[in-house]
């Protein structure tokens, strides 16, 4: 199957619109991501979200008054995004791929959010094309927010229920080097491996944070519950500790934030 077919199949079988609102791990991921966006995004910024899904972030930012362009690969998600964005004249949504943002000129946006594409890009060429395109369309001094998955969290959240050998073989080779291939659906990275993708690019890392802690794993426990007051306390703890390097691999979702320096990337 082609990558686009794999991604379409994944999101045709799940409710992406509800993921960030109805589960504690999704809520924490959203809270954390928006905290960093609000802390760093200038007023009246022009924002591009690549892999916008159903518009959770694009719609929220447009409602706050930002000028938002959203690009989404999956037709089903795009339809829901447009439905969610009704009445928002400062949000435009188009279908497209993170590896080719040719519809947008160089240095066009104050910030680019790529909060999903790296989950479904499996080859170094595609990783570099997606990152280079995000950097290209960002203004010098602008911000690039890129989400990715921890390969270690994938292993212990998805494969501790009796199929650990399968998960080990799928995510690591015999020498425990991380594997990436399309049939994974979701691909994870070692943190240092992901940071190295930016080597030689005209950017400076300014933050690396985990966004959902261990809640993806915790919710699989029988009887797991996090009532509102307990969740509020956990959020306070999480926001204080989410950049601690030793804890990053325990998060399922991570957020890399960098600032574009002078100079341009090639298309």
Regions found by a protein language model. Name each.
Residues 1-44, 56, 60, 144-171:
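Conserved class I S-adenosyl-L-methionine
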Residues 184-202, 208:
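Short alpha-helix
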Residues 102-112:
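A short acidic, Gly/Pro-enriched loop at the edge of an enzyme's catalytic core
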């Amino acid at each position: 199957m082609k990558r686009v077919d794999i991604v379409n199949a994944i999101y045709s079988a799940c409710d992406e619109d509800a993921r960030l609102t109805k589960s504690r791990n999704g809520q924490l991921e959203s809270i954390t991501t928006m905290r960093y966006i609000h802390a760093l995004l200038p007023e009246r910024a022009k924002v591009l979200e690549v892999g916008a899904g159903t518009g959770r972030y694009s719609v929220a930012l447009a409602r706050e008054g930002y000028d938002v362009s959203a690009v989404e690969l999956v037709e089903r998600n795009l339809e829901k995004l447009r439905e969610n964005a009704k009445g928002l004249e400062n949000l435009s949504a188009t279908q497209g791929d993170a590896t080719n943002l040719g519809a947008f000129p160089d240095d066009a946006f104050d910030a680019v959010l790529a909060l999903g594409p790296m989950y479904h890009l499996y080859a170094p060429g595609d990783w570099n094309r997606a990152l280079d395109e995000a950097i290209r369309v960002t203004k010098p001094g602008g911000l690039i927010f890129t989400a990715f998955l921890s390969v270690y969290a994938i292993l212990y959240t998805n494969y501790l229920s009796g199929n650990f050998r399968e998960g080990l073989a799928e995510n690591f080779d015999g020498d425990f080097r991380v594997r990436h291939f399309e049939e994974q659906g979701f691909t994870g990275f070692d943190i240092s491996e992901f940071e190295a993708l930016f080597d030689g690019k005209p950017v400076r890392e300014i933050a690396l944070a985990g966004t959902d802690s261990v809640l993806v794993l915790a919710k699989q426990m029988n009887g797991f519950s996090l009532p509102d007051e307990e969740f509020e306390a956990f959020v306070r703890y999480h926001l204080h500790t989410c950049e601690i390097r030793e804890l990053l691999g325990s998060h399922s979702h991570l957020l890399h934030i960098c600032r574009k320096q002078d100079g341009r990337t090639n298309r």
